[in-house]
Regions:
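Charge-rich, solvent-exposed alpha-helical interaction surfaces
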Residues: 23-27, 49, 138, 142
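Conserved beta-strand-loop-alpha-helix junction that forms the acyl-donor binding cleft
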Residues: 150-157
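Short, low-complexity Ser/Thr-rich regulatory SLiMs
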Residues: 91, 106-108, 124
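Active-site rim helix/loop that mediates acceptor-substrate recognition in acyltransferases
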Residues: 43-85, 90-92
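Conserved N-terminal entry element of GNAT/NAT acetyltransferase domains
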Residues: 1-45
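Conserved beta-strand in the GNAT
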Residues: 96-107, 116, 121
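Conserved acetyl-CoA-binding loop-helix of GNAT-fold acetyltransferases
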Residues: 122, 128-142
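Short coil/loop residues immediately preceding or within conserved phosphate-binding loops
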Residues: 82-84, 112, 117
Length: 157
C-alpha cells in the first residue's frame, strides 16, 4: 500500500488538507476489529487521558497537536458522568483518529437504554457509523459498569 509522505501532511494547513481528501482515500489501510485492544481505565485515568491529549473547542474534540480534520464532531460532552467510550485507530499518516464517543449514564442503565451520540462526524479514514456500530456492539458485549473504558490499538497510557 502507498504511503502518503509525511512532509505533505506537515506542510498543509487545514484547508489544503481537506483538498487532499480524494488523494488520501487511496492511502488508508483496511481496518479490522481485531486490530484494536481494550484498555480499562479508572475514572481518574480517563479524565487525565482526555485532558492530556484532547481539547474541546466549539463542539469538537481534537488532538492537542492537530486540527479538527483528525477530530470528531459530537452533540454533547459530559466529562463528569458515569462512563466514557473512546475509540482511536492509528492511520497511515501517523495520526490517531477518534472514531467514536459514547456516554453512559446511571438512569440509562436502570432503564436499559444508552445515550448514543449518533451525530458523530467521522473523518474520511473510516466508514463512520458502520464502524461505530461494530465497536458499540463489542463494547456492550464486554461492558463492565464498574470501569471506564477506552478502545485503542496502541498503548497510550
Amino acid at each position: 500500500m502507498k504511503e502518503l509522505p509525511n512532509n505533505v501532511i506537515r506542510n498543509c494547513n487545514e484547508k489544503k488538507l481537506l483538498n487532499l481528501k480524494r488523494i488520501v482515500l487511496d492511502y488508508i489501510k483496511e481496518f479490522k476489529l481485531e486490530d484494536i485492544t481494550w484498555k480499562y481505565l479508572t475514572k481518574e485515568k480517563m479524565r487525565k487521558f482526555l485532558f492530556d491529549n484532547y481539547y474541546i473547542n466549539n463542539n469538537f474534540i481534537t488532538w492537542n497537536d492537530n486540527d479538527t480534520i483528525f477530530g470528531m464532531h459530537y452533540l454533547q460532552w459530559h466529562l463528569y458522568t458515569d462512563k466514557y467510550f473512546i475509540g482511536t485507530i492509528k492511520n497511515n499518516i501517523d495520526k490517531e483518529t477518534i472514531v467514536g464517543c459514547i456516554s453512559y449514564f446511571n438512569y440509562h442503565k436502570i432503564y436499559g437504554n444508552v445515550n448514543y451520540i449518533s451525530t458523530v462526524e467521522i473523518n474520511y479514514f473510516y466508514q463512520g457509523m458502520k464502524l461505530l456500530n461494530e465497536l458499540y456492539k463489542n463494547f456492550i458485549n464486554e461492558l463492565d459498569f464498574d470501569k471506564d473504558i477506552m478502545i485503542t490499538n496502541e498503548s497510550m497510557i
